[in-house]
Each structure stands twice: as structure tokens, then as C-alpha cells.
Amino acid sequence: MKEIDYSELSFNPMTMVAKKWMLVTAGTMDDYNTMTVSWGHLGSLWGHGGGRPTVVVYIRPQRYTKKFVDESEYFTVSVYPEEFKKDLSYLGTHSGKDEDKVSETSLIPVSVGESVTFQQAELTFLCRKLYVGRITEEGFVDKFIIEDNYPLKDFHYVYIGEIEKTFVE
């Protein structure tokens, strides 16, 4: 993996987030967990001169990875080529609490700064956690979203991370 400046990237964030699945990973090489996400945001927020480059990810309270993101100052968000869709599907449907799920995939964990990503990632953002909040029922104007996405009222936690380093394949 090669480190680049975030400003060198050129991609459609809507396509990347919505069409390509990503992994959110937190912890150390000795103790980490990862999960698949297909919802998220990229942009800039807080600060002068256009704001800080940020990533927003959403994690349900019952996800094992939440504990790792909560306990870590850093997390990674990584994007993969289409050929790894089966691996990402596995990581999104199995819990690291119950098994060493990464060993059931072809992905190879590697350390990046204060966190972990995988060798096969075509793009990895190393993010420093800036904000943690929770989506609430009261905040919804369109109540159909609750019916459609939260029948168990297990509203996502929102994590905003500042992109400190960017790595490409």
C-alpha cells in the first residue's frame, strides 16, 4: 500500500459508498474486529479553508465491531475490488465475537498507523474519531424510515472520523 494525500483522489463518493461495500475496522493487530458497511458519507466538516476531510459511518448497537470503534481513537474505512465481494459478504454476516471470521476469508490484515486494514484494499482511510452520537426516533421527520429500517428500534450510532492518512493499492 502506498500513502497519498487525500486531495489526490478522484472518485464518485456516491458510487463508492452505495455500490461498493466497505469495511470498518478498529483495534490493533493483536485484537481487532471488522464489519461490512454499505452506508456512509465522505466530505468535509469543521475547520477553516473547507473543513477537515471526514468519513461518517453508522454502526448498530448490537454489532461486535462497535466495541472496538468505541475503545479506539482510530478506525479505518477501506474499499475493495469486486473480486472480494464474497469475503465482504461473509464479514458482514458473521460476528467476530463468535469466530475468527477474517480467517474464513482471503483477506490479509495489515497495520496502518494506529489501526488495521487489509492488504487487498484498493483504498483505505485511517480516521481519528472526532464525534460519536446516536440516531434517535425523535429526529425522524419521515417516520417511514423507522418502519423500513428500524423495526427493532436499534438505531445506529454515528461515528465521524477525520481522515488523517489515505492509502491506495
Question: Over which residues does each language-model region extend?
Answer:
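Basic, polyanion-binding surface patches
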Residues: 1-169
